[in-house]
Amino acid sequence: MNRRGFLNQTAGLGLAALGAPNFARAAGTPNFVIIFLDDSGWADFKPFGHPNYPTSNVDRLASEGCRFNNFYVPQAVCSASRSALLSGCYPGRTKVFGAHGPRARGLDPSFATMGQVLQAKGYRTAVFGKWHIGDQPETRPPARGFDESCGLMYSNDMWEFHPQNPQAYSKFPLQFWENGKVKIERVTPEHQPMLTTWYTEHAVDFIQRNKSNPFLLYVPHSMPHVPLFRSEKFKGKSGAGVYGDVMMEIDWSVSEIMKALKESGLEENTLVVMTSDNGPWTSYGNHAGMTPFREAKGTGFDGGTRSACIMRYPGKIKAGSASTQAFSTIDLLPTFAQLAGAPLPANPIDGKSVWDLIVDKPGAVNPHDYYAFCTGPNFEAVMSGDGHWKLHVPHTYRTLVESGNNGKPGKFRQASIELSLFDMDKDPFETINVIDKYPEVAARLKMYAAQHRKQFFD
């Protein structure tokens, strides 16, 4: 099927010496809002194909902005994906792989974050939600460029009620933090239903208090990662089970954030990005999202690495549009820096500004030769910068053999793939190996794969 139819602290910054002054908004200085879901499937929302969940506010966001059908993450696992977003670096560069547990160091402070880049330019910065890129004093939000913060330091399933490893996770209580201090020492099943509400209330309050200051607001929701929880006001309201209720509450959160921007007179000058850290955790069956693509979270296939993405910026991004341009979370930091007039970090990064692609500038081409994908510390695939071709190097991967149900996981088995080339325009599901048909394309991507492996994995 045709793709187009199918569908350190400030030490790392060049301007570190400027600190983070408050200043009146300069003309044209945009705000940035990132709504980052956890394990949401590409097809979880109506603009991307799901007809059943009542998510009218996400639908409206898409109708007022652009739906990006080919948006990628470099690794389809929590910590690696979030570190890539905030640092603009591949996991191979930062060595942040997989999902970190309690007290992990996470993203080394030598890598500047998006918060630090914009904070040094005078932006107010906040993160309300799941952090998961460091759980030590020097790697928690206050030390990483965020003026305000609240939420969990890691996934909401890393607690004493884990369905498979309760003894391991019970050694460390799941804590709720606020501005560098523990607010709730032990998160319980009574607290979890309030997470989406708490994150949203903090986000709305932050917007209302920063009408005159440019800001970065990062809202990495804990949902719809298992275990699923929703507040009383959404229980049974979707008509589509617990997962539908959770998505309905996230839709409400989007509405509250957009309403706060409008009432504060900021919606015309704010770039809103909504996406997910990776594809769905399909082993959880009816407690997981959906993707039409091959495999899911925890693999280098598009079911894991392709995330639904919506962007809204009135007057800049065409309302009601859809794009098949390919780009990645690593590109958001340099893109935001360009729009804010902020210097890039002093440390090397891998992302590049893709603003011309986002606004569909005539003749714009992707600045990357390729994008790379890994799972854990294992390099697995490269894709041409335009998203047309994808080459998998030989590797093993997990594939679902038995789906779980009602919060209990199913079973995986190990599978393997040989050296394989896929034409993503004609075969977005990665089913037909065309490596013998296009030897020149394969040779070019093999060269990029060898370069990436040598630089980051050998």
Q: What are these model-derived regions, one by one?
A:
Residues 2-420, 426-458:
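Formylglycine-dependent sulfatase
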